[in-house]
Amino acid sequence: MAIHLYKTSTPSTRNGAVDSQVKSNPRNNLICGQHHCGKGRNARGIITARHRGGGHKRLYRKIDFRRNAKDIYGRIVTIEYDPNRNAYICLIHYGDGEKRYILHPRGAIIGDTIVSGTEVPIKMGNALPLTDMPLGTAIHNIEITLGKGGQLARAAGAVAKLIAKEGKSATLKLPSGEVRLISKNCSATVGQVGNVGVNQKSLGRAGSKRWLGKRPVVRGVVMNPVDHPHGGGEGRAPIGRKKPVTPWGYPALGRRTRKRKKYSETLILRRRSK
């Protein structure tokens, strides 16, 4: 990813660093509208995810996470920006005339060919079952349920590693550091997700953050007591508690929130590192 720095003419360009190469020109048959009337709200209109709202209108790009066009070679035609994720997407023209979007693998360029199937080469961008991959392969867009499509390692720069295969399961090390078991019949894509330098971008001003649909985050200690348990006091007062809590009074910063009896508890060999 090429980071473009502007001349220092205004505060926004003085502090900003954006990607100047990838543009967006989606195909009409691969996009659809989204319903965002109350961002961060549930069906009752109550805020369930704070600091969200506003933002520019978006069109959803239909991404092929299943990669079920078996043994049909496709060619990368474009590499595009997707406002719904921090990874890039690329348009694939398949040999049978079908066109689909997939996540852009790191290092893939326009003109490269990809294919999915059971006996395909271990090449960046190809999709195949875990049972056909050698140990140590870097993968992304990993299925959890067979045929449902990739659900793991889909963010920009994400990559997992196949570290073992035994019986009907394969052992993966995920980007979070978690080590877990997945069926060997599930498929994944070889390589790493592109746009690795997404964290190097600097928005430069608060307005650019609002375009993304993100609102300001206010500390509880500067609020009033009616708004947050940390609020109140004269001047810069401490929180007045032994440990910090959430706006609803539950313990924060360290309390484990995962349910103890989840079905995947036996599949996780090592918890993710924090």
Curated annotation (Swiss-Prot):
<dbReference type="InterPro" id="IPR014726">
    <property type="entry name" value="Ribosomal_uL2_dom3"/>
</dbReference>
<dbReference type="InterPro" id="IPR022669">
    <property type="entry name" value="Ribosomal_uL2_C"/>
</dbReference>
<dbReference type="GO" id="GO:0019843">
    <property type="term" value="F:rRNA binding"/>
</dbReference>
<dbReference type="InterPro" id="IPR005880">
    <property type="entry name" value="Ribosomal_uL2_bac/org-type"/>
</dbReference>
<dbReference type="GO" id="GO:0032543">
    <property type="term" value="P:mitochondrial translation"/>
</dbReference>
<dbReference type="GO" id="GO:0009507">
    <property type="term" value="C:chloroplast"/>
</dbReference>
<dbReference type="InterPro" id="IPR022666">
    <property type="entry name" value="Ribosomal_uL2_RNA-bd_dom"/>
</dbReference>
<keyword id="KW-0687">Ribonucleoprotein</keyword>
<comment type="subunit">
    <text>Part of the 50S ribosomal subunit.</text>
</comment>
<keyword id="KW-0934">Plastid</keyword>
<dbReference type="InterPro" id="IPR012340">
    <property type="entry name" value="NA-bd_OB-fold"/>
</dbReference>
<comment type="similarity">
    <text>Belongs to the universal ribosomal protein uL2 family.</text>
</comment>
<dbReference type="Pfam" id="PF03947">
    <property type="entry name" value="Ribosomal_L2_C"/>
</dbReference>
<keyword id="KW-0150">Chloroplast</keyword>
<dbReference type="GO" id="GO:0003735">
    <property type="term" value="F:structural constituent of ribosome"/>
</dbReference>
<dbReference type="InterPro" id="IPR002171">
    <property type="entry name" value="Ribosomal_uL2"/>
</dbReference>
<keyword id="KW-0689">Ribosomal protein</keyword>
<dbReference type="GO" id="GO:0016740">
    <property type="term" value="F:transferase activity"/>
</dbReference>
<feature type="region of interest" description="Disordered">
    <location>
        <begin position="224"/>
        <end position="252"/>
    </location>
</feature>
<feature type="region of interest" description="Disordered">
    <location>
        <begin position="1"/>
        <end position="21"/>
    </location>
</feature>
<dbReference type="Pfam" id="PF00181">
    <property type="entry name" value="Ribosomal_L2"/>
</dbReference>
<dbReference type="InterPro" id="IPR022671">
    <property type="entry name" value="Ribosomal_uL2_CS"/>
</dbReference>
<dbReference type="InterPro" id="IPR008991">
    <property type="entry name" value="Translation_prot_SH3-like_sf"/>
</dbReference>
<protein>
    <recommendedName>
        <fullName>Large ribosomal subunit protein uL2cz/uL2cy</fullName>
    </recommendedName>
</protein>
<dbReference type="GO" id="GO:0005762">
    <property type="term" value="C:mitochondrial large ribosomal subunit"/>
</dbReference>
<dbReference type="InterPro" id="IPR014722">
    <property type="entry name" value="Rib_uL2_dom2"/>
</dbReference>
